[in-house]
Amino acid sequence: MEKIKLGVICGGMSTENEVSVVSASYVLSNLNKEKYEIYPVYIDKNGQWWEILDEFKPRKFGEEITKKEKIKNEFKYLKNLDVIFPVLHGLYGEDGTIQGLFELLQIPYVGCHVLASSVGMDKVYAKVVFEKAGINQTKSVYVRKYNDKYVYIDEHFNEEILSDIDVAKKVQTRIDFPMFVKPSNSGSSVGVKKAENERELVEAINYAAQFDKKVLIEQGIIGREVECAVLGNEDVIASSVGEIKAADEFYSYDAKYNNQESRTEIPANLPKDIIEEIRKQAVKAFKAIDGSGLSRVDFFVENGTNKIYLNEINTLPGFTSISMYPKLFEQAGIKYEDLLDKLIELAL
């Protein structure tokens, strides 16, 4: 049987370049070499494309790709492929940008298409879609950086230009402390800070605005962080539910990738009806953005009430050894290698 020419793309120009490389190293190590002719590609932080010549082995976080060859004509290189697995996280890889390129070149690819990727990446507009779908979410406020000030945007999208201090005061009229402040277009908790008072809120808004001009401020929920993986196109299945036991105050970038004390619990120790509702809401969120292939959907379960709040959807979740997406399906009996086969099959 003729092998499928599979491109695996990693790296990218986002702040999640290193995470993407680690994810891709595990994908490359687990692909069936009898089934696929593999073309591994690295995009560096400047946007240059390289063919990876290193051996396929799991990499540590921050480990550089040493053997690579510059790709002179990216379009010609891509047109040679049967299907692409973009193991890219963050801007220019998970936001519909590269998916649009694949669409123009008419090459099948793993994962969500342009619209779903774009909406899933933009936390502000994802909230608009999820609200329309009737999915419970935390209260939130959206502001936009404008020169040395901010545009405060109310629930009807009316705008008002204010200083950072005045924006912080305005935010407090709509939501209470603690708050979580995050860039609208960012992943892996990059740029996220918790604010317990007005001073911390001002600092957090200015910090998040370094990563994206759109900043989302959310009401903090005292509860548990849980995640559910989904797989499919029209016929979508949901995994079991896993819980994040973060070493830090919340599941920050450092807690995800550097702090060994962070751990996961699969399946989460929750009542059966809560687990089933989370699985149902995960599929609903995926379909609300017109998702395809895969996503990981993150929720909070409030202490005391067990009320479920959708946190966000991740249309191209991590594939490292500690990543929840493959671990959730492994618990359901789908091995890593078989999961990759299924994702590629869905793309084709």
Predicted region positions:
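ATP-binding N-terminal substructure of ATP-dependent carboxylate-amine bond-forming enzymes
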Residues: 1-115, 119-125, 144-162, 166
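Active-site nucleotide/adenylate-binding loops and adjacent lid/helix of ATP-dependent enzymes
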Residues: 2-10, 14, 22, 78, ...
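Hydrophobic beta-strand scaffold residues
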Residues: 38, 108-109, 137, 179, ...
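Glycine-rich beta-alpha junction loops
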Residues: 45-47, 145-147, 185-187, 221-224, ...
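Glycine-rich phosphate/pyrophosphate-binding beta-alpha loops
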Residues: 90, 189, 244-247, 314-328
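Phosphate-binding site of ATP-dependent enzymes
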Residues: 193-280, 304-309
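Conserved metal-phosphate-binding beta-hairpin within the catalytic cores
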Residues: 219, 228-230, 286-319, 329
